[in-house]
C-alpha cells in the first residue's frame, strides 16, 4: 500500500458498490447495533473494528482483506502506515466512515463534493493545498484510465481546471470555492464518480464517450480525433472536448413549455452536427460530416438536414416516426400557467417544479405517450446505456430511473389519457411496477410492455419481447409497441400460514404470483445460488458465470437429492379436492401462470389447441371448468395467462428439468389445471415465487386469484425478428 496512499482504486470501488447493492442494511441501522464500547475510542475506530463494521454493513461473513484494508487506509490521514504493521493502534474517524457510506447510499452532487473535499483535506485545516490538489488530480487520472479515456493530454487540463477554482489566488482551494466551482465543472463531476442528473432545462447531461468516427466539437469546431474521447450530452447530442465543456452553450432541449404561447405547438429544435446517417432528409443528398462541423439535427423528430436546407423545412415539428410515444414540450406546462379558478385550485400545494404534481400534461391527440421505467442495475451496464438512449429519443421527463422508485413517474402520468408503460428490467422489476400500478388505483389501468434486461425474463419471453436486450435499435422496439396487442395477465395471491410449532422461516419474498410458484428441487438450486451471490457478489458479474454456478448447484442437487419423495411431505388440494400423488416419485411441484420458467423452460410442454377451443380446454368441459385432473383431457389443455387458471406440474428431479430445458423431453408430469390451490407441508422446504427463493418451515399455502393486469403482447415473430418467443 505504499503507493497511491489515501486512494481507493476504481476497481475496488466497483467491488464495494456491488456488495452495497446486495446489502439490505443502511449505515444508520448498523451503527444502532454496533458494539461501540468494544471497538471504538470516542470517535475513533481501529482496523479490527472497521472490519467488523463492514461485515455487518455488507451482510457478509468475510470481506476480502485487500478491499477492507484499502478502504480503511483511504480514511487514514497518517502517511506512515503500511499493511505489515497494521494494529489496533491505527485508527480512523468513525464520522468519516458514516459520511462516506451515507453518501454512497444516496446524496446530491453538492453533498458528495463536500464530502470529497473533507476526504482529501488530510490535515483537516479547511483548505486544499497543492499536495492535496495533486492527490485529487491523481485520483481523477486513475478514474479516467478506468473509463478508458485517453489520458495523455488530460493532466494539464485538470491542472488548469483546479487552478481556476482558486478565485482569490491564494494558492489553495477553500470548501466554498470547491463546491461552487465543482458543481458546474463537468469533468470534475464525471471523474470523481458523481452522477449527473437532470435538473431544470438548460443543463447538459454529460457522459464521456469515445468516438469511432470523425466528429467535431460544437464549441471550438475542431476535430475531437478518431478514437479519442470527449463529452456528449445525453439530451441534445452536443459534443465537446473535455476542456471545452465549461464554456459550452446551454442545452437546447426544453422539456416543458415555459409560457402560454409555447403550449400546443412544438417547433423544431436544431443542433449543429450529429448527422450520423450521412444523408439529408430534405434533399436526400449526402451530408459531408467527415471534414467539418456541418449539418443540423432536430432533437425531437431527429430529422437530419444540410444547413442550406433549413429554410425549406417548416418551423413546426411533428416529433417524427415516434410521435405516438413522445410527450413534446408543448404538451407539458406548469400548472401556474393555468388561468382562472382552476389555477387557484391546483396551485395551492405547488412549491417547486421539481415535483410531478407541479406540471399539467395535455398530450397530442391520437397519441399514446410512453412512460419508461429503467432499472439501471439490470443487465450489468445495459440499464444505464438504455437510460441514456431513451433520454434522447423521448422527452427526458418521460424516462424514470428506478433508483427513486416508480411512484414519481406514475404521479407525473396520473392524468394522462391512453398512456402506455415500458418497463426496462428483469421479471422482478416488472412485478414491482405491476404492484405499484395496482396500488395506484388508476381509473383506466395502463398496459405494460417489457424490454428485458439481464437473464431469465420468463414473462418477457411469453409476451414476445425476447429473452434479453442485446443492443437492438430502440426505435424498432418502440414501433413494435405501437402495433402490439393488449392481453391480460392473471395475478395470484400467495398466502403463507405458518404452523404453530416454533420453527422459523425466511421472509416470504412476495405475496403476489405473476409468473410461477414452486416447491422442491428447482427452488433448492435457486436458494443456494441466491445465498452464494449475496455472500460473493463479485463472482456473479456475467451471464456465463451465473450459468456455470447454476450448473454446479444443479449437479450437486442431482447427487444429494435433498427434496427426494416430496409427495410424502406435501399434500395438494385443488379447489377443495385432494390431488393424488401416491403413484409418483417427485422432487418438485411447480404452479405455472405462464408457460416459461427458469429462463425459457416450458414445464407444461407444447400443446396444439384443439380446433375451435379458444380457452385451451376441451370443448366438452366448456369454458367455465375450474378444475381438470383427467390425464387425457390435460393433454389438450393449453396454457393461457388470461384464463384465471393455473397449471400444476410435477418434477421428477434435476435430470428431468435439464431434459425439458434442452427439449430432450417435452414436459413434466401434468397434474392439474385449476383456479385455486392449497398446499400443506410437514417439514422445512425450499420454495420460490417468480424466481425469488426462500426456506419455509411447515405451513399452509393458499393460492387464489387476485386480479388481472393489461400487458402488451409483441407482434408475431418473423424469421428475422429477434423479439419473438425464443425458449
UniProtKB/Swiss-Prot annotation:
Tissue: Lymphocytes and oligodendroglial cells.
Residues in DAGKc domain copies: 365-498
Keyword Kinase: yes
PROSITE patterns: DAGK, EF_HAND_1, EF_HAND_2, ZF_DAG_PE_1, ZF_DAG_PE_2
Record-annotated EF-hand domain positions: 108-143, 153-188
Residues where Ca(2+) 1 binds: 121, 123, 125, 132
Alphabetical UniProt keywords: Acetylation, ATP-binding, Calcium, Cytoplasm, Kinase, Lipid metabolism, Metal-binding, Nucleotide-binding, Repeat, Transferase, Zinc, Zinc-finger
Xref: Pfam families: C1_1, DAG_kinase_N, DAGK_acc, DAGK_cat
Binding site for Ca(2+) 2: 166, 168, 170, 172, 177
One example GO MF annotation: ATP-dependent diacylglycerol kinase activity
Subunit relationships: Monomer.
Pathway involvement of the protein, from the record: Lipid metabolism; glycerolipid metabolism
Listed SUPFAM superfamilies: Cysteine-rich domain, EF-hand, NAD kinase/diacylglycerol kinase-like
Activity regulation details: Stimulated by calcium and phosphatidylserine. Activated by sphingosine.
Similarity field: Belongs to the eukaryotic diacylglycerol kinase family.
GO CC terms of this entry: cytosol; plasma membrane
Gene name as annotated: Dgka
Residue numbers carrying N6-acetyllysine: 476
GO BP: any one term: phospholipase C-activating G protein-coupled receptor signaling pathway
Protein name: Diacylglycerol kinase alpha
Main localization of the protein described in the UniProt heading: cytoplasm
Reactions catalysed: a 1,2-diacyl-sn-glycerol + ATP = a 1,2-diacyl-sn-glycero-3-phosphate + ADP + H(+); a 1-O-alkyl-sn-glycerol + ATP = a 1-O-alkyl-sn-glycero-3-phosphate + ADP + H(+); 1-O-alkyl-2-acyl-sn-glycerol + ATP = 1-O-alkyl-2-acyl-sn-glycero-3-phosphate + ADP + H(+); 1,2-dihexadecanoyl-sn-glycerol + ATP = 1,2-dihexadecanoyl-sn-glycero-3-phosphate + ADP + H(+)
Role summary: Diacylglycerol kinase that converts diacylglycerol/DAG into phosphatidic acid/phosphatidate/PA and regulates the respective levels of these two bioactive lipids. Thereby, acts as a central switch between the signaling pathways activated by these second messengers with different cellular targets and opposite effects in numerous biological processes. Also plays an important role in the biosynthesis of complex lipids. Can also phosphorylate 1-alkyl-2-acylglycerol in vitro as efficiently as diacylglycerol provided it contains an arachidonoyl group.
